[in-house]
Amino acid sequence: MSGGKSGSRLSAYSHLKEIGKGGFGVVYAAQRENGEKVAIKRIDKKVPKNRVWTEIQTMKELKKSKYVVEFYEDFVEDGYTYIVMELCEGGSLQAYVREHGALDDATAVHVLRQLISAVSFMHRVNVIHRDLSAGNVFIKDSKKKKMTVKLGDFGLATTLGRGETTCTIVGTPGFIAPQVYDQEYTQSADVYSLGAVLYTMLTARNPPPKGLPPTCGMSPNAARLVEQMMDTDAKKRIPLTQIVLSEFMYENTNENAVIFSREHSRDGRRQRSREPVRSSRDDRSRDGRALIRSSSQPAHSGRAPLSNRPIHDRMPSTSSRGFDSERGRERDRDSGRGTVPPSREDRNRSQLWPIRMDRLEGQRVCTAGGRYIVELDTRCRFEVAAQGNFVKRILIVEVDEMVQTVYVHRIPDRTVRGRNGEEELITLTNNPFVYTSYSQMPKEVQNDYMRLQKMVAVTISGRVAKVTFRRPSQFPDAQAQLMENGDLRIKLPRSVIVRKMDNGEIFNCIDGIATQKQAVSGITLTKVNEVYKYLIRFEQCLNGMDRGMVCFPIVFSAGTNMVGSSPSSLMPSGSSQTSRFPFSNLSNNQPSLVPHSAPFLTKPTSSQRASSANVQRRVSTDENSSPSVAPSKYKIKIDPTTQKVRSIQATDGRVLRCSTSKADQFIFTDPAIRPDDQRFMRTDRVPDRASEMLHTLCERMRKLHQ
């Protein structure tokens, strides 16, 4: 195909070569006048114009996602519609596995994580792909274990909510959810298709048109995830947001994981090798690098599968190992310390990627190596200091629906000095390096990331109380706190008893000074372990609540008959519930937050009882206060003349302004993501990270007009 007539839009492209052909048109590789390689899709004249328009609008809408084939431009010549887009020279994922064979588990997980990010972005803007298959996943970079892919071909995509959205049979056989054939489907159909793509990556074969595909030859966790994603019952199908929590994803994101090699016999059947192949990180670990031998990455863990954990509380339970195990009882007898929970290594391993920051917002720590700040429950930063207290780079870690992205902003040498905890944030650069997995990062960034992860998981989490038990019967003049990192603190009038989670060590800090430690023994040791066991079980009960209920942090007090009782026996039940387990009503204006769906809480039978069963969550108390926490997350500016709200600014530099030229238009600036302003109407899709600011701004405007 030639580049078109002189002077035409198509003539600006040369070296056109056909690289693909489908029912709706032909795709060419081409070259721009500046030498840039692109892909050009020529859509057949017979394709309905509304479908062409939908594909173009969808690509424009998804342009912000880095895992979607980027849209450049479109034009019409001689009745044909041309779409110019990013060229992925590696071809389709389907063609790649046919030529090179199945991917190993680690590479498949790396690709799946990118596709989850792309589909999550699509669903946030209410788009269903409807033809998500291995043939529509294109390879940008096929380097081993770092394969970069892009999702493309949105010719069948549609917006959720339109008349024909859930009642049209489209897609590629084998990748189509059963609900599509029934002409009743939602976004979960894309999850089924993602499962089919995962199956193709692991087997180099397309799944059968109907029924669950055979999973022989896969690792057990891989087979389990494929079955969960391709469950024929949409209601039982694993949600998109929980795929990253599966054991298969976890074990192949952690660099110490075993990767199963796959061999193909002459008849094409795949067999699992008897010898496990260690990831490249295991090979690197032999040279003695400190990063590889970090205590936060043990080779083995006794934790429960992530897929079995409640999603509503993303911080792992401090009680993921059973207390009645034989080995635990032996430790109890030998040490006299009582129950020994999972080690800090186990917890840090589960928090390596993504970093879990729930309920840690506002915490700051300054050290000689830099400043650590948890800006939001989904965003933290590390301002890395070099010699002379000059900042050399800033790591920003953001978690969106359990998909984590790391932005690295490099600061010119000796231009910015480190700041104290109370001082304002350092301005970020406009062109950060972006990483979506641990293995992508260079060694120096990996070291910085591990320092940040350890600071959040150990030090900062140890400052925030998750459960506060006021006046336990063992220590009537004290309060016991189970911290976010699993430590126990019992605050007495003149001292603080601490029980460390990682090694079970128990000591008493006189006057709260860590250097003045005293050993704890005898009856006091027994009482400490009783309180600890009780709080662990209490936390377990709360973790069993409905997924939509966020219960932590929680503050409560109990009666005097707690010793030897289980949490469930002490919770309200029957006519005596008021006197047996009264939750402290910390605020007279706080409505009852007792979740009626909790397995161990009973709905009060009268208003009198309800007043004694009030639970306050997310309270601002001394337990969770930090001297560095800002009094407010946002700063609102009001025009002194008109008394109208002009803008709202977040502590991390984001600014949302009201447009002065057009009513109901807003201007959003997010220097951490992009330097330019984003304008949008109130009825448009709100940019990422602006939703909460817009809600706060509108609420303030509404109150001013009352």
Swiss-Prot record:
Probably ubiquitinated by the SCF(sel-10) and SCF(lin-23) E3 ubiquitin ligase complexes, leading to its proteasomal degradation. It is an enzyme of class 2 (transferase). Gene3D superfamilies: 3.30.1120.120, 3.30.1120.130, Transferase(Phosphotransferase) domain 1. One of its GO terms (biological process) is cellular response to amino acid starvation. Residues 13-249 form the Protein kinase domain. Protein kinase that plays a central role in centrosome duplication, control of centrosome size, spindle formation and nuclear envelope breakdown during cell divisions. Paternal copy is required to regulate synthesis of daughter centrioles prior to fertilization. Maternal copy regulates centrosome duplication during later cell cycles. Functions upstream of sas-5 and sas-6, and is required for their localization to the centrosome. It comes from Caenorhabditis elegans. PROSITE patterns: PROTEIN_KINASE_ATP, PROTEIN_KINASE_DOM, PROTEIN_KINASE_TYR. This is Probable serine/threonine-protein kinase zyg-1. Residues 261-351, 566-632 are annotated as: Disordered. GO terms for cellular component: centriole; centrosome; cytoplasm; cytosol; nucleus. Pfam families: Pkinase (PF00069), Polo_box_2 (PF18531), Polo_box_3 (PF18544). Its main location: cytoplasm. It is found in: Cytoplasm, Cytoskeleton, Microtubule organizing center, Centrosome; Cytoplasm, Cytoskeleton, Microtubule organizing center, Centrosome, Centriole.
